[in-house]
């Protein structure tokens, strides 16, 4: 998954997350060869299937999964990989692209899914950085500092959490809710597709 679709304000953190996710993907292939991790942690609960993928709500509010991180059942059977991360920062959702032979429609609402603890990032990575004390004073001295200060305002884009297909919705409104300011964005900000009223996966 590319980081190019991420909103500019949250760019630094999201690009870091994407790079980590790609690394996680490679790690996942190695891990699959070596078997599942020694322990798995609960990361989400299944809400409903969307386009043959699982839409899950995040149940670990201080952690965000890597993109492409393997997702397991409690018995460590791998069922898929994290495909997209969606929704506002205080109500995060993610989709799981299923492994061959696995059907998202076979799961029941609130079924738990699990992840290796090594495939999680602290949510602080995706929050705006606090302003440095005295930064305004230095910027107020004028000259080149002032434009930089204004440029820094771009970080407002990272205020919330994740946006794109939005958060949950009913089956008809699949992934169609949240979005807009302050959200995780994924797979580009393409024009809305007709199918659930959500943003597409890129142009």
From Swiss-Prot:
Key word Repeat present: yes
One GO CC annotation: box H/ACA snoRNP complex
Family from the record: Belongs to the GAR1 family.
Subcellular location field: Nucleus, Nucleolus
Source organism per UniProt: Cryptococcus neoformans var. neoformans serotype D (strain B-3501A)
Transmembrane segments: none
Region of interest (Disordered), residue spans: 1-38, 131-203
Annotated region described as RGG-box 1, given as residue ranges: 4-28
Residues covered by region (RGG-box 2): 150-202
Gene from which this protein is expressed: GAR1
Secretion signal span: none
Biased composition (Gly residues): 1-28, 140-195
Protein's UniProt name: H/ACA ribonucleoprotein complex subunit GAR1
GO terms for biological process, alphabetical: snoRNA guided rRNA pseudouridine synthesis; snRNA pseudouridine synthesis
Entries under Pfam families matching the protein: Gar1 (PF04410)
SUPFAM superfamilies linked: Translation proteins (SSF50447)
Transmembrane helix recorded as keyword: no
Function, as annotated: Non-catalytic component of the H/ACA small nucleolar ribonucleoprotein (H/ACA snoRNP), which catalyzes pseudouridylation of rRNA and is required for ribosome biogenesis. This involves the isomerization of uridine such that the ribose is subsequently attached to C5, instead of the normal N1. Pseudouridine ('psi') residues may serve to stabilize the conformation of rRNAs. The H/ACA snoRNP complex also mediates pseudouridylation of other types of RNAs. The H/ACA snoRNP complex mediates pseudouridylation at position 93 in U2 snRNA.
Keywords tagged on the record: Nucleus, Repeat, Ribonucleoprotein, Ribosome biogenesis, RNA-binding, rRNA processing
InterPro entries (alphabetical): Gar1/Naf1_Cbf5-bd_sf (IPR038664), H/ACA_rnp_Gar1/Naf1 (IPR007504), Transl_B-barrel_sf (IPR009000)
